């Protein structure tokens, strides 16, 4: 034991020593076996000029010392270092190598790093201290077999970091045996933010952390960065502007991700992802190895509600395959399209519908496969260029018709390789009906056919007039190409003008039809900026 101790100047030792010498007739006595067990020592030791034990330096120490039956006892050991003090009662048995101590300390824990094995050092290196921790503990073990070391006590920290993430305070019970570190009822403060748990276990041999019944109101990115850079990178796109309420439990790997099995119950907001801005969201997040599952997601969604789920399967290199389903009701068209397409056009109405993506990759939105449906109620949509391109023509037929509100709109659609296809988009208003058939991709490119039916929905007479004026409906069949923000319409067929002569007297707007039907319809209102596809962030 003494061979592990060094000092620049010998310590001062005062006291009484008693021992039994070997018989004078014994010319070759075994001093260790015969004499050392008889030594009795009572005294005081002082090391005023500092020293070291196995590379652990101290500025000074002192203690009463008792030694008998090969057992050292230091009942009032005081150790000084620049940052603080350690007070301990120590007992060490030379025969067995066992030791036991009661310790109160304000020393920097990094001082004991030379005493730890490589795995223990890695755990200690995760923490940096501005102020030394306050520790009261019992410690026991074997001087030559440090893996048998055990500890039980309490720790309080202030102004420290863990994996670079700062905290203003921590209080916890702590136990350590057999390379397993257990924190009992830990409480962490980060300014006004709080975290707590029933328990946190650290298996240093398996390099795993076990979290039991965690609760917090801390920024999620602080927690994920403390877990590890890889998981932080994968969730950084999901941003809570205020810390949510979180319940967390499960297994966290200290290195890698394959053994992760961590559950989050989150409830809070405002929340942002991609271009979406939501005032409130809640749900269950399950991180399982290289997979991430989002279940029971509920959100306030642009004046309405949305629910959904998602699965992500991460691949080497950072990309992920994923699938998701979203169901929305009573969403406001204007605020939703403003966020999705970055437009300021006047758009109104209520939307509800479903979107199910069965296969996709984060590498490209052109990998999307899926399906869904949309429904519109009481909508004003004419400042969406792909609809507004026909507004002038319809107003020429019947003043105001091209600006009337859509009483209802419906469509079902499929998605294949990032191309959306619908064969039944139907938009209705009083006196008019638009039907779209075609495709739209995530770059905003459109390829569709549009039919505009006049008077079909006019009360009482609409269906009759629409049948009588069947040629008028066919006149408004166009092929639409270009983009959502800059569509181009070309007539598919034109009806001979003579077919309108019987209706010129009762329907005065038909007189101006010639000037209102150019061969190429281009949409360029000064108050309608170009739509940007959701792909462009």
Model-derived segments and spans:
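Small-residue helix/turn framework positions
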Residues: 1-18, 38-49, 57, 71, ...
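Gram-negative outer-membrane assembly/targeting C-terminal domains
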Residues: 487-537
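Short loop/turn motifs that connect adjacent beta-strands in outer-membrane beta-barrel proteins
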Residues: 25-32, 146-147, 257-258, 362-367
């Amino acid at each position: 034991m003494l061979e592990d101790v060094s000092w620049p100047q010998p310590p001062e030792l005062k006291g009484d020593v008693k021992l039994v010498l070997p018989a004078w007739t014994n010319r070759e006595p075994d001093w260790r076996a015969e004499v050392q067990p008889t030594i009795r020592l009572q005294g005081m030791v002082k090391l005023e000029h500092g020293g070291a034990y196995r590379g652990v330096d101290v500025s000074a120490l002192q203690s009463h010392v008792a030694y008998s039956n090969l057992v050292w006892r230091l009942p009032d050991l005081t150790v000084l270092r620049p940052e603080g003090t350690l007070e301990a009662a120590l007992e060490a048995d030379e025969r067995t190598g066992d030791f036991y101590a009661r310790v109160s300390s304000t020393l920097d824990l990094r001082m004991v790093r030379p005493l730890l094995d490589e795995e223990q050092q890695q755990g200690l290196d995760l923490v940096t201290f501005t102020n030394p921790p306050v520790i009261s503990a019992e410690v026991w073990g074997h001087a030559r077999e440090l893996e048998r070391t055990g500890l039980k006590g309490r720790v309080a920290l202030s102004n420290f970091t863990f994996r670079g993430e700062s905290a203003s305070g921590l209080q916890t019970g702590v136990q350590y045996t057999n390379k397993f570190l257990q924190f009992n009822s830990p409480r962490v403060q980060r300014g006004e933010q709080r975290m707590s748990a029933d328990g946190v276990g650290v298996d240093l041999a398996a390099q795993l952390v076990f979290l039991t019944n965690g609760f917090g109101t801390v920024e999620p990115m602080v927690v994920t960065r403390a877990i590890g850079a890889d998981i932080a990178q994968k969730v950084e796109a999901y941003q809570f502007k205020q810390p949510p309420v979180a319940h967390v439990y499960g297994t966290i790997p200290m290195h890698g991700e394959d053994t992760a099995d961590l559950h989050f119950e989150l409830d809070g907001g405002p929340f942002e992802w991609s271009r979406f801005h939501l005032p409130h969201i809640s749900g269950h997040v399950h991180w399982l190895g290289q997979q991430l599952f989002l279940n029971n997601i509920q959100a306030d969604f642009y004046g309405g509600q949305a629910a959904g789920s998602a699965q992500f399967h991460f691949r080497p290199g950072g990309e992920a395959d994923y699938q998701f389903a979203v169901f929305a009701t009573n969403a406001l068209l204007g605020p939703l399209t403003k966020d999705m397409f970055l437009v300021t056009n006047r758009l109104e109405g209520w939307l509800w519908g479903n979107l199910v993506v069965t296969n996709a990759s984060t590498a490209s939105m052109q990998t999307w496969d899926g399906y869904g449906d949309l429904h519109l109620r009481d909508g004003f949509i004419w400042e969406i260029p792909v609809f507004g391109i026909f507004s002038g023509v319809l107003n020429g037929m019947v003043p105001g018709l091209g600006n009337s509100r859509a009483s209802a709109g419906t469509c079902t659609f499929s998605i294949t390789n990032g191309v959306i296809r619908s064969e039944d988009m139907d938009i209705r208003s009083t006196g008019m009906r638009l039907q779209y058939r075609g495709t739209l991709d995530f770059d905003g490119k459109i390829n569709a056919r549009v039919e505009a039916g006049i008077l079909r929905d006019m009360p009482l007479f609409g269906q009759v007039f629409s049948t009588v004026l069947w040629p008028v409906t066919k006149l408004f069949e166009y092929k639409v190409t270009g983009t959502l923000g800059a569509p181009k319409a070309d007539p598919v067929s034109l009806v001979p003008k003579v077919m309108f002569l019987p209706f010129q007297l009762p329907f005065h707007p038909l007189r101006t039809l010639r000037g209102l039907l150019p061969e190429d319809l281009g949409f360029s209102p000064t108050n309608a900026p170009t739509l940007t596809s959701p792909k462009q962030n």
